[in-house]
Amino acid sequence: MYTEYQPCGLLSAYIDKYWVFKGKTELGTYFKILPDGCCDFIFSIGDTAQCVGTNQPVMQPYRCFFVGPMTTFSELVTNTPSVHMLGVRFHPCGLTAFCKPPLSEFTNQRISCNDLTLLFTDSFAESLCEAQTLQQQICLIERFLIHRLKDNYEIDPQIPFAVQQINRSKGRLPILQLMDEICICQRHFERKFKAYTGYT
């Protein structure tokens, strides 16, 4: 039902993985999603699972949705007998190579790409639905992203390095030690880190 796929080498610094959630489900099945520091674009290739909670967008078939960095878990519930979704999960800081808005604006947000001009659009989602195979869908995504890399939104190398150090220490690295390792003042780092990752 849930399967993960690795990106091509050129995109692996930015994309954690592609994932597919497809299959028959029982109506009313809940799935818990834990915060992982990443953000996702979700393409509804067919029927979808819905976000639980108030003020959540209804995920309609053949559309694109953006899920910003999460600080708390969220839940999906199935309202159909089957689901088919394809996701692109970006590494922390990975999305900033493709677009400019600070990710802090999207923390804990789930937004229809129809309401957002960030990267993908609903028309792109429709072209994915027309592809015959998953491999063709991933090829379309990768071609689009590689083309967008030419826009060359530069990422401050200190921030991905800091994320790497935080992950390596499993989140136990003291902030002062991290500041020493990346040679930046704490206030400046916090501002950049929030913009690039959506987290404080």
Descriptions of predicted regions:
Residues 1-170, 174-176, 181-186, 196, ...:
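Alpha-helical bundle regulatory/interaction domains
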Residues 193:
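DNA major-groove recognition helix of helix-turn-helix
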